[in-house]
Amino acid sequence: MSAATRWPEQLVVAGTDTDVGKTVVSALLVRGLNATYWKPVQCGDLMVGGDSGRVAALVGLTAAQASGRILPEAYRLAAPASPNQAAAAEGLVVQESRLALPAVGGPLIVECAGGLLVPLRDDLLQITMISHWRLPVVLVARSGLGTLNHTLLSLEALAHRGIPVLGLVLNGEPHGANRSSLERIGRVPVLLELPPLAEPGPAAFDAVWPRVRAPGCSA
């Protein structure tokens, strides 16, 4: 799987909302770029391994491979809630020092929790940590009705903080009008329109990867 040469060494996968498909997109990038994966804060789904376990399965990693390429979360919180609320339920406060980027050799994919402005604690938004990391963002959004408002608001928030955006991944049934509107108004490329995958996993990702538009490439 090529195209890795045009991608930055490290990047953040963020979303316009929760449950927009960040984990599937992260897994696609981990497989396509042969990258390491890190989700700093996991809220809920601990019994099934959380998103880290899901990425390992989607990428097709053995247990031995996953131990080297799926990094442990800084926070594993039981409640399926925003990080500030999930941490408070356990008597914890999320500390920035624990969210420092890990040192890895090779590409790194960092998956955020929820949307850009979700609070990690009451005085620390997730987008602030993205700014501290100084990494570019792949923004995952829904493809259908409502995505223009959510996506343009997210792009505005990123631009306001000077955070570079590599491009968008639109998750769901392709919607040509929304794609063209976002590229024209948001002035960012759509890297991929990702339709629902019947069986997400290595074979599906390998079939999709050639359609991914590497950052900086013309359509």
What do the predicted segments below correspond to?
Residues V13-A14:
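Hydrophobic anchor at the beta1->P-loop junction of P-loop NTPases
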Residues R121-G144:
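Inter-motif core of Ras-like GTPase G domains
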Residues L99-R121:
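Switch II (G3) loop of P-loop NTPases
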Residues K39-P40, V138-A141, L166-G172:
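Short internal beta-strands
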Residues A4-T5, E156-A219:
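C-terminal lobe/tail of nucleotide-utilizing enzymes
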Residues A4-Q10, V24-V93, R98, P102:
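N-terminal phosphate/diphosphate-binding loop that engages ATP/GTP or pyrophosphate donors
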Residues V20-G21:
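Conserved glycine(s) of the Walker
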